């Protein structure tokens, strides 16, 4: 993979996060359509039945309901070959039901790490680790 392709893949990762930070479901959905292959393989367990790009759209719709003011800060971004790895800090206010927990109004900060694999300029596979424990602790489900 060329240096230009690696640079473009990193830019796509950042663009995805910039779209997420708009808090606008339509902007996020359009960005997913542009950056993610419709049949992308999502290797992160998701609480929905959809697959591919549609799964990501549904996850983001859910996240915007839970944390309408969600904000992602990319702390580290590493690219090699066809993969981009990002470590992100996520903040938001718990304003929608989350895993059966009614809104608490509490501020939440958690970390996640995602790997995006690219082919022909689009995301074709993802892996992710999201710190759900931190979210549950901060909204009071798990004792601190």
Regions found by a protein language model. Name each.
Residues 1-144:
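C-terminal and inter-domain tail/linker signature
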